[in-house]
Amino acid sequence: MQPMVMQGCPYTLPRCHDWQAADQFHHSSSLRSTCPHPQVRAAVTSPAPPQDGAGVPCLSLKLLNGSVGASGPLEPPAMNLCWNEIKKKSHNLRARLEAFSDHSGKLQLPLQEIIDWLSQKDEELSAQLPLQGDVALVQQEKETHAAFMEEVKSRGPYIYSVLESAQAFLSQHPFEELEEPHSESKDTSPKQRIQNLSRFVWKQATVASELWEKLTARCVDQHRHIERTLEQLLEIQGAMEELSTTLSQAEGVRATWEPIGDLFIDSLPEHIQAIKLFKEEFSPMKDGVKLVNDLAHQLAISDVHLSMENSQALEQINVRWKQLQASVSERLKQLQDAHRDFGPGSQHFLSSSVQVPWERAISPNKVPYYINHQAQTTCWDHPKMTELYQTLADLNNIKFSAYRTAMKLRRVQKALRLDLVTLTTALEIFNEHDLQASEHVMDVVEVIHCLTALYERLEEERGILVNVPLCVDMSLNWLLNVFDSGRSGKMRALSFKTGIACLCGTEVKEKLQYLFSQVANSGSQCDQRHLGVLLHEAIQVPRQLGEVAAFGGSNVEPSVRSCFRFSTGKPVIEASQFLEWVNLEPQSMVWLAVLHRVTIAEQVKHQTKCSICRQCPIKGFRYRSLKQFNVDICQTCFLTGRASKGNKLHYPIMEYYTPTTSSENMRDFATTLKNKFRSKHYFSKHPQRGYLPVQSVLEADYSETPASSPMWPHADTHSRIEHFASRLAEMESQNCSFFNDSLSPDDSIDEDQYLLRHSSPITDREPAFGQQAPCSVATESKGELQKILAHLEDENRILQGELRRLKWQHEEAAEAPSLADGSTEAATDHRNEELLAEARILRQHKSRLETRMQILEDHNKQLESQLQRLRELLLQPPTESDGSGSAGSSLASSPQQSEGSHPREKGQTTPDTEAADDVGSKSQDVSLCLEDIMEKLRHAFPSVRSSDVTANTLLAS
């Protein structure tokens, strides 16, 4: 429908020239009123009304003026003619005024009717809004509005004609605006009445014209609104029908899903892929739902609200779509969780590593923990790992920390079955899992995957049955205890590879070469920072066992400096130089070499008798005294400190972890003969160690080490104990005589206070003479000379190594005062520096006393347990010891019984009884000495008693 446009009419029209001529005529008539001719004056004052709205005819006036101007005064006949004409015109003017009054009344009524009708139609048009949000109702509304527009359109010609009449009337009778309002007089002139009527008609015509334009514009706008609303409703209806069909299909597919518990584990990846494809296939529905909701929102903005039926349908579609999305997401999550928990790479198979009442659970960061339903407790350690740690406590009676640590690691190695894993196999697994980058951070799942592949490969290569879940779980537990005690669930790849390489069953040299390659650059060179990182990772292994203090503590900087002495001043070190340093068995890495010797010595039998316990053959390590002839000690007696009267451990002793050869026997014979002529003062003056010591300076660890995991609350206590032990070891290395005065040499000795040499089957054995007996060697002078020459070469090599150690000790001891001087020079106030130094010394002295008191209490407990065992052995019946060669029977037998059974030794005390008496007497002396010292310490430091009790409790736990 085309919009109806009404032509505007000028309601205030300019006056025509006839109306202006009439005004001029009135003006000239007034000027001629002074004329002496009354006829002319009457004719002038009575103008004729205008003809047909064209104004007053000017012809008669012109003739009149012309006659007057031409011939002067009119003649009487002419005057009468003019007077008659004036009367006629006056009569016509009166008629015109009456006609004008009737015409204005005829315009006012139609205009008012038009105004009322337009107002009514405008109200009817407003009543059609708002539209209903239904297609049928909107179509009905569209038809109604079309009829309404036809009605308005049909009324248009009449309205146009009335407005045109009003325009014509106003053009004939224009009006002037009132300048100032004035009170209307009772008698208004005809001109004023005409002005008022014209003004009223103009107002009515203006209102009617505005209402008409407004109505026609609203009709057009509402028509467009109805058309647009109908299109949107049709689009919404079609989209909802399509969405409903698609949702029904998707819900049908969802109904065919099987429960997760009924699915096979192998089919889980296929179901996961199917769910992902299903999700992608129905992803366009998201756009359709969004389109429908947007259209509904646009209609709401246009004040068109969906009907109840359409609203319910739209709400149902939204609900179904959300339910479908939730079900698909939940299904995918369940499948992924099932695949993670039960799939090939899951931890579900590890649940079989524990037995009832234990249960294996997983924390949010995938770290396993264990629940004891019977005791209703939880712990981080596997039950088998807890039992293993309890068995490790049995090895605490070993006096020498390197062997104690190695023995503990050997038990852990066997429990984890890592002694069966070769480094080559481990490297293959590392490469398969892309662990070449040592800076890579592994999570628990990656560690489990690597360990699982490692043990499965072990089964394939060795053809043995391995409890893979148990081994994987315990290995994971041990790795977390060593490198992630805070259970963050993350560890560096270098840490993982270091732990596996240290415990695998491979030669020490290969292990060290591999570990060095992990921190070396492309040129097989390593700087101090990376070497410090490697040593820091390696020292975590004994640290987890509580043995780090004996290996220089957690500060690896002194070890790095010691190693870089082989670099000849270069900022980097090569692999050969690193191996040369490690072959000297430095203090921080000696435990790894001892572990290797412990592993080899397990299967070795020495065809000789232990001089203390009489065990024959000696299994494991064999220790030969280089001070006395024919004195051999088994590893049990040696490591636990059992010794006879003449076999003091501060004398040189040779360790064998392989069967001895004739050349080794001859060499030891010559060394023993030489030591026979040396006094005890010589050995105390020339102390030698079985490892390369590292001067431990109390300094800040400025080497760059990886960030450690969060520690548990008791970690600070362990750090303090470690610090005290390190300082105590430093004081002992500075010729501290405290323990030498209070304890016997057998009780105070540790592995760094005697010469313990180990015989290597590679470096110390001569193959040409390995199978010859001592008697045959003695008969051949040439062979004897060669052996003596080899012995001298070995001694020369040992002496050179000792000389090198002494030089390093001297240099490192010289570095320690320089560090102290550097820190002193930094002080600005001398007096404050003295006070700080004095306070520091007092603090150190107090720490030394606390540490000594703690160690003395431990020694006292050990002595009490030894005395208790001796009493039990002495109280045993004599019949149980007859014919026995064990230590227990020897200790239980009396001197009289020994004389009766061994007449050849009459008049001599048996070595076993003499050793028992010696141990008993020394134990009593030591106990008295300890009690005296403890009493003095308690009086000197009464305030530290509670802290010592707490520390002892933690150590005992």
Swiss-Prot record:
Spectrin repeats lie at residues 102-179, 231-337. InterPro entries: Dystrophin-related_2, EF-hand-dom_pair, EF-hand_dom_typ1, EF-hand_dom_typ2, KCMF1/Dystrophin, Spectrin/alpha-actinin, Spectrin_repeat, WW_dom. GO terms for cellular component: dendrite; glutamatergic synapse; perikaryon; plasma membrane; postsynaptic density. Detected in fetal brain. Coiled coil: none annotated. One of its GO terms (biological process) is central nervous system development. The modification Phosphoserine is found at S748. It is found in: Postsynaptic density; Cell projection, Dendrite; Perikaryon; Cell membrane. Residues 877-923 are annotated as: Disordered. The modification Phosphothreonine is found at T910. PROSITE patterns: WW_DOMAIN_1 (PS01159), WW_DOMAIN_2 (PS50020), ZF_ZZ_1 (PS01357), ZF_ZZ_2 (PS50135). Interacts with PRX; this enhances phosphorylation. Identified in a dystroglycan complex that contains at least PRX, DRP2, UTRN, DMD and DAG1. This is Dystrophin-related protein 2.
